[in-house]
Every structure is written in C-alpha cells, then in structure tokens.
Swiss-Prot record:
It comes from Cereibacter sphaeroides (strain ATCC 17023 / DSM 158 / JCM 6121 / CCUG 31486 / LMG 2827 / NBRC 12203 / NCIMB 8253 / ATH 2.4.1.). PROSITE patterns: RUVC. It catalyses: Endonucleolytic cleavage at a junction such as a reciprocal single-stranded crossover between two homologous DNA duplexes (Holliday junction). Homodimer which binds Holliday junction (HJ) DNA. The HJ becomes 2-fold symmetrical on binding to RuvC with unstacked arms; it has a different conformation from HJ DNA in complex with RuvA. In the full resolvosome a probable DNA-RuvA(4)-RuvB(12)-RuvC(2) complex forms which resolves the HJ. The gene is ruvC. It is an enzyme of class 3 (hydrolase). Its main location: cytoplasm. One of its GO terms (biological process) is DNA repair. This is Crossover junction endodeoxyribonuclease RuvC.
C-alpha cells in the first residue's frame, strides 16, 4: 500500500509518500509545495497544481491529512483552512480515501507522546524510515501523518478481520 501524508499550509504544504508492506515502512519521497505571496486564489491554485503533480507522479493508494489548529489570528486560521481544503480535495479528486488525524494523534503514534516537539518528530521519522533525507520540517510532519495513517489502517484491518472471524 502506498500512502501519501499531507501537512497543510498556505506558504509551505508538506507531503510525504511511504510504501507499507505488513509492518515494514519504506520511504518513497517527500517534499514541500510552496506558494509565494500574492492573491489567495492564485496561491491556492498553485498548491492544487503542485499537489496534483505529486499524486500523478507517485500514484498513492490512500492519503491522510493533518487537522489544523485554531490560533488567535482568525484570518490566518481561515486561510490555513482553505489550504487544508486543497489538501483534502486533490486526493479525493483522484478517487482516494482520505484519512484525517489531529496533530496530537500523529505525534502520539509516531513519537509516543502527544505533545512532541518538531525535533522529536523528525528524529522518529528518521528512525521509522532509515536513510530518509527530509525536505524540511513540513515534509517530516507529512511523513509522520503517512506513518500514522499506515498504523491506523493496519489496526482497523486487524480489528475487522478479528470481528469477521468472531462472527463465523
């Protein structure tokens, strides 16, 4: 299974692709979609195009997006929400199921602590994916989202299999 993780952002949208085979994880690629300053519509269009290119290039089977947090600046929160909309839309347009995870759930899954620092996330991503060269903190966060999604998909698959066996 190939998983695309996305860390939404208006200026820098991180993405990371991993392959999952049983309990084995393998890094495929990671990067950042950038949008320069300018009007919001063109920035969102740029992110849409870049993320569409990532999907076309790496052909993931499923995707996951991190929830955004609400900060004190309402305008910034709304803009971030619009970028998150692009992060949800592009994989959905490609016909993929899209998982969504709270930042604390991602950190808990990858680091073991729900309030981990960015450095801890990067360290654990490197441990889970040996040899990975991170394109930046946003790409590391996106890979962490992909790892979290892989873990949850595997867990739910095991649960469904156990329930099916129990129902026989």
């Amino acid at each position: 299974m190939r998983v695309l993780g996305i860390d939404p952002g208006l200026r820098n949208m991180g993405w990371g692709v991993i392959d999952v085979s049983g309990t084995r994880l393998a890094h495929v690629a990671n990067g950042i979609c950038h949008s320069d300053s300018g009007d919001l519509a063109h920035r969102l269009l740029s992110l849409h195009g870049q993320l569409t290119d990532v999907l076309a290039r790496f052909q993931p089977d499923t995707a996951a997006v991190e929830h955004t947090f609400v900060n004190k600046d309402g305008v910034a929160t709304l803009k971030l929400g619009q970028a998150r909309g692009i992060a949800l839309l592009v994989p959905a347009q490609a016909g993929l199921a899209v998982g969504e995870y709270a930042p604390n759930a991602v950190k808990k899954t990858v680091v073991g602590v729900g309030h981990a620092a960015k450095e801890q996330i990067q360290h654990m991503v490197r441990l889970h994916l040996p040899g990975v060269h991170l394109a930046g903190p946003d790409a590391a966060d996106a890979l962490a989202v992909a790892i979290c999604h892989a873990h949850h998909v595997q867990s739910s698959g095991r649960l469904e299999a156990a329930l099916a066996r129990a129902a026989r």
